[in-house]
């Protein structure tokens, strides 16, 4: 086996024990702190208290699922790997498309590189939308909870997952979808013992429940039990998140929304601007496709600065940037973002047109993400790490660097 693997200009040491990197979708640090304080997450509590290393990191912008999962598994920001949303306007096709196809990925992954070098690699994701991106050119086991009953050796590198896990295939809108990921990960570590494993959950619970609530604490208690078991099995464990989560509603419980397409249409007329919401994915029931980040494309370049200035003056808007400035500040691919990039404040979300958002599935006040307010995420490791500069800006895509390069090596 090689001693080092270089991927996207970052070099990683070969693992000396199994490494499990966990992306807990929507995990604002307060969820962990509240569960520890309630006494339901003793393992995480021990890591934070000094049995491991507890850091706070920044996720990439926009603070959505696809850009951050792909940053974690490539070790680089979206400006390099190309995945800048769950959804984008494809200028080559002239249409709005989901960003789930590996053709949109511009670099290889750490997972694929290690598998090509002979490592046993496994990926388990909650939603199937991520599976092909995470498993791009990777040899090994790769499946989703969502479609665990449809796995095959040819497509997924494994079979009979449902029987092995001992759980029925969960609803996409459930805590059980993420629990399936963890239980399956434990089963794989017990039997196949992969060298490298990536587990990615869904944020259904975080969209529904605030930190410290019974529902949230029950969810983190489940995570805690499974992480403790992976530790018992001898794995190095790195836990991070793709983004945080915040309340985005008014005092009356209604979503605090700026319908930006309607607003711009009223200013300059219809069909002169297109608002894209990169939070959009096939699973909108728990967030109504409302997040704190939007892209604006304008038919007339001369309108850009005037429209940007008017957007910046709207109540609830935090940041408005032109394309080049946004690409530089947020490390985004300039050819895949709008003429104008808009970020709303912590308690506000951005919609397109009022009649394009079905909010009937919101049975609790809206919680969502996408802005800089959701950039701070946990970065926990169950080992000591070698000393790092106090000024280092930790990123969630440093997870593999921590687990392979900086964690104290086994004796």
Give the role of each language-model region.
Residues 32-76, 122:
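Short, structured active-site-proximal loop/turn typified by the sulfatase FGly-forming signature C/S-X-P-X-R
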Residues 26, 241-245, 346:
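Active-site metal-binding loops of divalent metal-dependent hydrolases
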Residues 29-31, 81, 129-135, 205-209, ...:
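Short catalytic/ligand-binding loop motif for oxyanion handling, primarily in non-cytosolic enzymes
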Residues 228, 245-297:
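Acidic/histidine-rich catalytic neighborhood
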Residues 277-411:
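Active-site neighborhoods of enzymes that stabilize oxyanions during catalysis
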Residues 71-210, 286, 292, 298, ...:
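His/Asp/Glu-rich, glycine-adjacent segments
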Residues 1-52:
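Active-site-proximal N-terminal segment of extracellular/periplasmic enzymes that hydrolyze or transfer
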Residues 13-14, 174-239, 243-247:
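A long, amphipathic alpha-helix that forms part
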């Amino acid at each position: 086996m090689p001693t080092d693997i270089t991927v996207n200009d970052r070099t990683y040491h070969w693992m000396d024990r199994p490494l499990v990197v966990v992306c807990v979708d929507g995990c604002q640090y307060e969820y962990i702190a509240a569960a520890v304080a309630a006494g339901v997450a003793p393992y995480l509590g021990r890591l934070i208290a000094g049995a491991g290393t507890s850091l706070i990191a920044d996720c990439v912008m926009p603070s959505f699922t696809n850009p951050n999962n792909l940053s974690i598994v490539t070790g680089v920001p979206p400006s390099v790997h190309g995945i800048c949303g769950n959804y984008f306007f494809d200028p080559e096709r002239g249409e709005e498309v989901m960003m789930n196809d590996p053709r949109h990925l511009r670099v290889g992954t750490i997972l694929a590189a290690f598998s090509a070098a002979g490592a046993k690699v496994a990926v388990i994701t909650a939603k199937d939308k991520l599976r092909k991106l995470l498993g791009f050119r990777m040899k090994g086991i790769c499946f989703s909870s969502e479609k665990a009953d449809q796995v095959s050796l040819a497509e997924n590198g494994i079979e009979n997952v449902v029987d092995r896990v001992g759980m029925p295939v969960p609803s996409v809108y459930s805590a059980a979808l993420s629990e399936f990921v963890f239980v399956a990960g434990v089963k794989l570590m017990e039997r196949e013992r992969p060298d490298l494993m990536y587990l990615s959950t869904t944020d259904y619970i975080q969209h529904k429940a605030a930190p410290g609530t019974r529902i949230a604490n029950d969810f983190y208690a489940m995570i805690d039990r499974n992480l403790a078991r992976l530790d018992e099995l001898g794995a190095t464990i790195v836990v991070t998140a793709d983004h945080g989560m915040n309340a985005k509603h008014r005092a009356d419980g209604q979503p605090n929304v700026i319908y930006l397409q309607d607003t711009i249409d009223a200013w300059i007329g219809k069909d002169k601007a297109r608002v894209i919401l990169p939070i959009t994915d096939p699973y909108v029931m728990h967030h109504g496709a409302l997040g704190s980040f939007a892209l604006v494309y304008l038919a007339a370049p001369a309108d850009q600065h005037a429209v940007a200035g008017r957007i910046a003056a709207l109540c609830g808007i935090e940041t408005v940037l032109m394309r080049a400035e946004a690409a530089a500040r947020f490390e985004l691919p300039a050819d895949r973002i709008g003429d104008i990039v808009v970020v709303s404040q912590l308690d506000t979300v951005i919609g397109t047109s009022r009649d394009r958002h079905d909010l009937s599935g919101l049975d609790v006040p809206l919680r969502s993400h996408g802005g800089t307010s959701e950039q701070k995420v946990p970065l926990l490791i169950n080992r000591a790490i070698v000393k790092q500069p106090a000024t280092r800006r930790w990123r969630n895509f440093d997870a593999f660097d921590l687990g392979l390069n900086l964690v104290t090596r086994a004796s």
